């Protein structure tokens, strides 16, 4: 059984990680250890590079906190131009996989508040009345009428980031 350290305590992210690992490595193939670590970037990262830096830093911090594991995984959500997206970074003892998620265009009314310095989650909670929406369906769930959720989009990115770990051609 793989010991997977998730650099998050967010249920939407943990669910995506657990589901992806189960699909790639088999049901009950891993034990998740969720830890809260700093990203080293603002609460609402802006741009692809700042967001990826946040995910990479979370992995570094998770490895320092829990050095005995098979995998360390971080998901960092950010804003790029007029959209929200995330970076997934996965590391093992000797390898790294990274993938960027699908992007969701955001309405101007939401973007204006984010550009004024607010994080997307609290802005969406205020607009929808859903407390802690970032730990649930997220903006993705709201704007796709529930067809996708934060977790489902993260799940795809985790699957992509896992590709180097189960395909020999990457080694």
From Swiss-Prot:
Binds 1 divalent metal cation per subunit; can use either Mg(2+) or Mn(2+). It comes from the Bacteria. Substrate binds at residues 8-13. Keywords: Hydrolase, Magnesium, Manganese, Metal-binding, Nucleotide metabolism, Nucleotide-binding. InterPro entries: ITPase-like_fam (IPR029001), Non_canon_purine_NTPase (IPR002786), NTPase/PRRC1 (IPR026533), YjjX_NTPase (IPR050299). It is an enzyme of class 3 (hydrolase). It catalyses: XTP + H2O = XDP + phosphate + H(+); ITP + H2O = IDP + phosphate + H(+). The keyword Manganese applies. Its cofactor is Mg(2+); Mn(2+). NCBIfam families: inosine/xanthosine triphosphatase (TIGR00258), PRK05074.1 (NF003459). Homodimer. PANTHER family: NON-CANONICAL PURINE NTP PHOSPHATASE_PRRC1 DOMAIN-CONTAINING PROTEIN (PTHR34699:SF2), PTHR34699. Belongs to the YjjX NTPase family. This is Inosine/xanthosine triphosphatase. It comes from Cronobacter sakazakii (strain ATCC BAA-894) (Enterobacter sakazakii). The lineage of its organism: Bacteria, Pseudomonadati, Pseudomonadota, Gammaproteobacteria, Enterobacterales.
């Amino acid at each position: 059984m793989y010991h997977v350290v998730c650099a998050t305590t967010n249920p939407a992210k943990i669910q995506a990680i657990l589901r992806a690992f189960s699909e790639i490595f088999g049901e009950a193939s891993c034990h998740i250890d969720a830890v809260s670590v700093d990203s080293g970037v603002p609460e609402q990262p802006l741009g692809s590079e700042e967001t990826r830096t946040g995910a990479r830093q979370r992995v570094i911090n998770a490895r320092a906190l829990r050095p005995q594991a098979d995998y360390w995984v971080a998901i960092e959500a950010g804003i790029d131009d007029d959209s929200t997206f995330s970076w997934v970074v996965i590391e093992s003892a000797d390898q790294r996989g990274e993938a960027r998620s699908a992007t969701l265009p955001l309405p101007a009314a939401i973007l204006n508040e984010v550009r004024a310095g607010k994080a997307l989650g609290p802005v969406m909670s205020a607009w929808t009345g859903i407390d802690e929406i970032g730990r649930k369906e997220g903006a993705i769930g709201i704007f796709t009428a529930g067809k996708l959720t934060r977790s489902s989009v993260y799940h795809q990115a985790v699957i992509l980031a896992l590709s180097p770990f189960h395909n020999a051609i990457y080694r």
